[in-house]
Swiss-Prot record:
GO cellular component, one term: spore wall
Localization per Swiss-Prot or TrEMBL: Secreted, Cell wall, S-layer
The keyword Secreted belongs to this UniProt entry's keyword annotation: yes
Keyword Methyltransferase (UniProt): no
Biological role: The S-layer is a paracrystalline mono-layered assembly of proteins which coat the surface of bacteria.
Primary location recorded for the protein, binned into one broad class: secreted
Descriptive protein name: S-layer protein 2
Alphabetical keyword list: Cell wall, S-layer, Secreted
Amino acid sequence: LDTDLQGTMPEVYASERAAFL
């Protein structure tokens, strides 16, 4: 799931990751 987000929308992936951290 993380890979899909990173591939399609890097910005959203970064935001999600930042939220987790």
